[in-house]
């Protein structure tokens, strides 16, 4: 008799029972560990290292999640955020597959950084997206050089993921963190809007104002906080970004 296949394990940073900003309706939000990006505004740098996460199987997480199913209504479900969920793509696909088998709406909150159209990785991404109802794509900066400064990574694969999601008609929300002196210039916002307007699958655009609530975590981990001295955007700049990006629900 062949040995029983070992169940996949994911490394989880934290869980949120009643998420209201991570997808439609009320969400059970699973924050995974591990991320290759080093966003200067990251408020969870303690998620960067996958090894610090708590191991869970898909069944264990779903057992926790369905306790709150009565609060989800027609719109709610589970959202996997991070960290970067696509770094644990095999586990994530298994989790979403089992969730869909129970009729649970699945949302992927991703930076898009691990995306590629090449090789086995692309096949895994395609399998994941088949069991993903909604993708929330975080576009940190439209300018590639500025994106590298802000996150340590290129934005080319991120923008290509947006294009691919458009090609396959996968529902998508786009979120953009508004950081003074980094991503809030009108030129950048106008270019980002033009890119978003070229896509046909975007259901919603959101501006997320930069905040300093996670700055203390950098210091606790022994890291220098790169945005020291930069204040959150003013209401005027937030309003300006919302106007330039035509934020809100799209038909």
Protein language model annotation of sequence segments:
Residues 53-63:
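Short cysteine/histidine-rich metal-coordination sites, predominantly Zn2+-binding motifs
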Residues 46-50, 148-154, 222-230:
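Short glycine-enriched, charge-decorated loop/helix-capping segments at active-site entrances
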Residues 53, 84, 150, 181, ...:
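Pocket-edge positions in alpha/beta enzyme catalytic cores
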Residues 1-21, 173, 178-251:
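Auxiliary Fe-S-binding modules of radical SAM enzymes
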Residues 66-70, 74-77, 86-213, 220:
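Conserved AdoMet/S-adenosylmethionine-binding subsite of the radical SAM
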Residues 79-81:
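Short glycine-rich or small-residue beta-strand-to-loop segments that form or flank ligand, phosphate
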């Amino acid at each position: 008799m062949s040995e029983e296949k070992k169940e996949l394990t994911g490394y989880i940073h934290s869980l949120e029972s009643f998420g209201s900003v991570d997808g439609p309706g009320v969400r059970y939000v699973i924050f995974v560990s591990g991320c290759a990006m080093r966003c200067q505004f990251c408020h969870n740098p303690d998620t960067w290292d996958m090894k610090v996460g708590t191991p869970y199987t898909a069944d264990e997480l779903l057992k926790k999640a369905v306790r709150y199913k009565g609060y989800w209504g027609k719109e709610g479900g589970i959202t996997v955020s991070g960290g970067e969920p696509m770094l644990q793509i095999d586990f994530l696909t298994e989790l979403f597959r089992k969730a869909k088998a129970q009729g649970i709406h699945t949302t992927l909150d991703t930076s898009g950084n691990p995306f590629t159209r090449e090789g086995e990785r692309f096949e895994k991404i395609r399998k994941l997206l088949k069991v993903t109802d909604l993708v929330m794509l975080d576009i940190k900066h439209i300018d590639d050089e500025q994106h590298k400064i802000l996150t340590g990574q290129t934005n080319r694969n991120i923008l290509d993921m947006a294009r691919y999601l458009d090609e396959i008609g996968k529902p998508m929300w786009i979120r953009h963190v508004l950081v003074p002196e980094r991503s809030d210039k009108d030129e950048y916002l106008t270019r980002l809007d033009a890119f978003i307007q070229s896509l046909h699958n975007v259901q919603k655009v959101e501006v997320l104002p930069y905040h300093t609530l996670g700055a203390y975590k950098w210091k606790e981990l022994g890291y220098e906080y790169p945005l020291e001295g930069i204040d959150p955007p003013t209401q005027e700049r937030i309003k300006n970004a919302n106007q330039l990006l035509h934020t809100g629900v799209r038909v």
